[in-house]
UniProtKB/Swiss-Prot annotation:
It comes from Shewanella halifaxensis (strain HAW-EB4). N-formimidoyl-L-glutamate binds at residues 145, 320, 322. Its cofactor is Zn(2+); Fe(3+). Belongs to the metallo-dependent hydrolases superfamily. HutI family. The gene is hutI. This is Imidazolonepropionase. Zn(2+) binds at residues 73, 75, 243, 318. PANTHER family: IMIDAZOLONEPROPIONASE, IMIDAZOLONEPROPIONASE-RELATED. Keywords: Cytoplasm, Histidine metabolism, Hydrolase, Iron, Metal-binding, Zinc. It is an enzyme of class 3 (hydrolase). GO terms for cellular component: cytoplasm. 4-imidazolone-5-propanoate binds at residues 82, 145, 178, 246, 323. Pathway: Amino-acid degradation; L-histidine degradation into L-glutamate; N-formimidoyl-L-glutamate from L-histidine: step 3/3. One of its GO terms (biological process) is L-histidine catabolic process to glutamate and formamide. Binds 1 zinc or iron ion per subunit.
Amino acid sequence: MSWDQVWIDINIATMSPKISEPYGAITDAALAVQDGKIAWVGKRSDLPEFDVFGTPIYKGKGGWITPGLIDAHTHLIFAGNRANEFELRLKGASYEEIARSGGGIISTVNACREADEAELFELGRQRLNALAKEGVTTVEIKSGYGLDIETELKILRVARELGKHHHVDVKTTFLGAHAIPPEYKNDSDAYVDLVINEMLPKVMAENLADAVDVFCENIAFNLEQTERVLTAAIDAGLDIKLHAEQLSNMGGSAMAARLGAKSVDHIEYLDEAGVKALSESGTCATLLPGAFYFLRETQHPPIDLLRKYQVPMVVASDYNPGSSPLCSSLLMLNMACTLLRLTPEEALAGMTRNAAKALGIDDHVGVIEVGMTADFCIWNISTPAELAYTYGVASCVDVVKNGNLVHQ
């Protein structure tokens, strides 16, 4: 038997629900890769005979393999920063007050409208490199900092180009309904018409999006407007997701679940009826501990209810310049545990198996199983819990992407 590569002297956190051990763990394990897929995984003692002279053999030095990390919610492509707003918040201004005074998302929109594609690409590349160094092999990138046809398309084109020129896979989400631009301040319905009738068709014509998102909140879009955008996305054949229940309980999550959303994100104010709706529809709940931390929120997502109703919990960075300027997947694992009280295993599942489900790619990534794409990381750790327990020590020693060893 011949394989493209074999890993030995390793432990594997498969994250597969088919294995009853915590983390789906296999200790004293081995893993084989062929044609970019996982060809064999199990105990090293059970490893079939193979051509040891013709097969590259890698030793994990007693560390751990996990699936490649998946950051399922980012706003990675933007220009400028909002450090001034950081100072304002520390002096007592609320996120909502800043947004209503013309700051917040709109200030980043203005910077993105002025930036060209080359500038946005380079900024995005640097941020994607930072995530990749921490073991991220797939990332979702949203638009939403254009709020006009030209800039929304520009951001999505840059996201697609990043995916073509980086080993990290990029899934794109059209978030034209992120905020109401100043020019539509007194006619938000007209802006929704623009998103549906002009922006979305152009996005589809260039194949720039895998999904559509909306910010459903009292400072952004109401339930009726949100449903209009999501329904148009469904009619166009795209997946849907939603920023919901971040600042108040508007019922957006239940509505999105009814429409078959892949995920609802933030959900600090989600109630039991909303959780039940997610459970019944198979919609994921995406937790964004970076925003919770940075905005110094006190309303916690309903973790116990999500467990009770067995809703898949996703952990993501929400990397953005206003509410989560924290470009670190590993920091999110730690915060998910320390701030939101997930277990380390739940947090890691939230950035592997469940994150893949939220992006609709769980048929080929998110767990270590035979037949899945060979996307995995090798960590210099003694237990998978270390990924959430400690922070600041680089422990990702190797990454395999599509069966190819990536030099970090």
